[in-house]
Structure formats: C-alpha cells, structure tokens
Amino acid sequence: MVRYGELFLKSEPVKRHFIGLLIRNIKRSLDAAGLSFRHETPRGRILIYGEEPRKIAAEVARVFGVVDVSVATITGNTPEELGRVAGALGKKHLTAGMRFAVRAKREKGSGGPDSQELGRVIGGVLLDDQPGARVDLSHPEYEVFIEARENGGFVYDHRIPAPGGLPFGTQGNALGLVSAGIDSPVASWMMMKRGCGMVHLNMDAGRWAGCATAAGAVENHRRLSLWVKGYPLRMLVVDSSPLYDAMSKGVPQRYTCVICKRFMFRVAAKLMPGEHAEAIVTGENLGQVASQTLSNLAVISSAVNVPVIRPLVTYDKAEIVAIARRIGTFNQKPGDLCCRAVPAMPSTAANLAEVIAAEEMIDVDLLIAEAIERIRVVTALNGEITVHEKPEHEQTSPV
C-alpha cells in the first residue's frame, strides 16, 4: 500500500496527471529491480500486488512522491474480519505491559461502525488476546492500522518512511553542479525530491584537484541514480584544468575561487538550452567557505542571467551530513579531495569590476568555449556507469 502526500492539494486534473507520473516512476523502479506486480488506484492510495511484497515495498520506499509504504493484508471490511487479521498480527508482536494503539479509518459509504468505534472494537480484540497490554494513543510502542473501504479492508502494522516530495519529472529539468563533496549531491537529491529532473555538471580540475576527486564525483552521481531507477541520469564532465592553469599565471589569487565559480555558472548557462534545463542548482551554503558570503554569492550569480537555486543555503553542515548519510551519498573515507588552487587568503567580498577585469586578462570566454568542446558524458542507470564522448546535439535530459 502506497501513500502519497501533498498531491491531495492539487486540482483534480493536476492530481490525476501527477499520480499517473508517480505510477510510471514506481513501474520503472520495480521493473529495474526485476519484480513482477500489478497495481490499482483506489481513492488516496496506490495498491501494488506481487509475490514479493517486502522487496516491492523496499523499492517503492525510494520513489520520490511517496510518503510511506506498508505491506498490508487484504480482508473484508466488517469489524469481525478486520479484527481477525489485526488479532493475528497482535499475537506476533504484543506482549504484557506493552503500550499499543489502533489507528482505524472507515471510508464513507462502506457501512459499519465509524472510525472511532471501529478502533475501539479492534482494540478490544487485541486486549482479549493479550490482557497485559494497555492502550496508549499518544506514545504507543506498537500500532495497528485499519482501513475499511467500500470493497474490502486492509490491515498493517508498519509504515516504511519514503522521501515524500513530488513525482520525479513533474517540475521540469535543472542543471546541477555535482562534485566529490558532501553538499552538492544532497542539493541535487533535494531537487529530485521536489520533482525536478536533473542533469549533472562536473568540473574536472585534473592535476589541480586531489587524486580521488574525479572518481568521487562519479560515485556521487552513481549513488544518486539509485533514487531514480529506470532513468538514465547523465553527468556532463568538463575539463576545467586550463582555467586553473591560466589563473595561476594572471589572476589575483584572492579572486581564484570566485572566478572559478563564475566559470562553472557560465559553462552551465551555455549548456542549459541543449539540456532543456531551466535553472542551475548548487550545493552552496551561506558562510560555509569564503566564496559563500552574501557578497561573493552575489558576484558569482551576476555571471549568468538564469535562475540559480541553492537548496542548502540555510542548512548547518551537520544537517547536510545527516541527509547525506540517510540518502547514501556520504563517504566515510573520501580520499584526497583537496583543491590545490585555493589561495591562502581568499576574498570574502570580491569587487565585481576587478573580477571582470581579471577574467578578461585570461580570456575566460575562450576557455569556456574550449571546455564545452571537450565534454565527456557519464551516464548512470540503476547504479551502473557508462562513459562516452558527447555526440553532437545529444539531449542529456533524464526525463
């Protein structure tokens, strides 16, 4: 049994469209896992039937737009039928002294006692089977969920949390800057959670980056693909080492990081039309490093005339790490990810005119054009990686 959240708030035509896309994404995920199934869509739920319900539930719990998933037992909608199934579950889990609650809901028009009375009846069944247990609706140790519908009933005692959000692919596409670090993959995941199709862009700094940097970025990209199974998730890899070579010779060192970020944004903006992307997404966080002061973020953003979305801008580092651990992109031993171009004293309030003058000194426009000519594409599908040169005019949108 699949529950979705804020889709209820949409108008009926939009809700039908979004539910259709959610079902499409569930199908792709289950097909990728090799699980056979069929589905139904009663009001407010998606029911999935299959011979491996727990495996199905585990896969569906990673689909964006799903709030939670339960392995449910189908029965009739009378108190007696619901009580027999609930009692069988209770006998497996309820012990003397344990606090429990029954969460019952009866659909209008299904007949029988209302939700509150149905909960009391089922609670009585559980107490008869385990007299030492006690009802506690506020802080239960065990819960049984009852849904009585017009055409039958469902009983379950566990809800597997899912990411929530909106179905992947309902909110257009964005180009996300993804590195080997912690923040950028979390930012991309959060955009996926809100229904946005993502194309990733990685800047390969070559000898200017730590030896584990390139592989770390690909690994982050690969792990993110496990959240959108059935979709080829693409990452454009740009050789940015010529930029660092040029900056090392002719740019005030204090502006290195700001110019680097502006370069990334300008490359992204050039690539956006071909990817049908409508925004740039970054893992930037207010005040975390020198380039992320409000002053420098403004200077960096001024390099482009497209929307720039920073999902993590207000998050503490500990909060970002917690999300990275939960979604599987946190690496306990990341290896050497150092940037060898970071100056000892980077500017925290870059002067825009001076930055533009420095860019002109090294002909950033030419560097951008040359970088785009050397793009490689890394495609991740269900956690499997393929690397190839980008064919001319190839679309890299995942949806």
Enumerate the predicted regions with their spans.
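A conserved beta-strand->alpha-helix junction
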Residues: 221-249, 335-340
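General small-molecule cofactor/ligand-binding pocket signal
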Residues: 136, 236-238, 309
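The feature marks non-catalytic terminal segments
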Residues: 335-339, 343-399
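A short alpha-helix-loop-beta-strand transition element characteristic
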Residues: 328-336
